[in-house]
Amino acid sequence: VQWEDPLETVVPKCENTRMKGTGSAGTVLLSSFYLAPIEYYSVLFRAPEVWMEVHDTYRKQSYRNRCVIAGANGPMALSVPVEKPPSPHTAMKDMRIADHGNWRHLHWNALVSAYNSTPFFDYYRDDFEPFYHKTYPFLHDFNEELRLLVCRLLGIPEPVVYTPSYIDVVPPGWADYRETIDPKQPLHSGETGFFPKLYYQVFKQKQGFLENLHH
C-alpha cells in the first residue's frame, strides 16, 4: 500500500508566497490556538496576509487551549491547564500555563498512542516531542511555537503580524475568523472556504472519517 503524507494531503505545500483562494480575503484575522484544526491551516495557507490577535480575551472551551485528536475510542480532547486569570478580561497573551497534573506527559502519550501506527509518525515525532518536555510560562508562546513548526512542515510562509492592541473595528475587506473557527461553530458554514477532504485515518474503519482534526 502506498500511503500519502497526511500533511501534504490535508494542506498542499506551497513554495514562497501565500496563496489566495476560495474564502480567502485580503487580510485574515485569527486567534492563537493549541495545535489548531485543519481548517485553521487551510486559512493560513490561502490568506495573502495574516494578523494574529493577541489582545483578545481568553475564552474557555475554545481551541485556545484545546485540541482534538482521533483516539482509539473516538475524538479525544486534550486541554492545556491554565492558571486562574486575574480578571475575566485577561488577554490571551497574558494567560499562564498551570504546571500541574503532568499534562505534558499525558498529552504526548495520547499523541503517541493515537498516531504511532500511522505511516509518517516516526518522521515527525522528533519535531513535536520537544514541546512536551519544555516548560512554557505563557499559553500564547506555546501555541505560537507549535504553529510556526507546523507552518514550516507544511511550507506555509511563517510571518504574521501581531496586533498591537485589540482590533475592535475590523477594517473593510478583512476576514475576521477569531471566533469563527470554534468547537461550537458548524464546520460546514463555508465562511472560511474550508471543505474537508478524505485522507487516511488509523481508526477510520471503526469510527468513520473524523473531520477537521488537530494534527
Protein language model regions, located:
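Residues lining hydrophobic/aromatic ligand-binding pockets adjacent to catalytic sites
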Residues: 3-4, 14-215
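N-terminal amphipathic/hydrophobic targeting modules at extreme N-termini
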Residues: 9-11
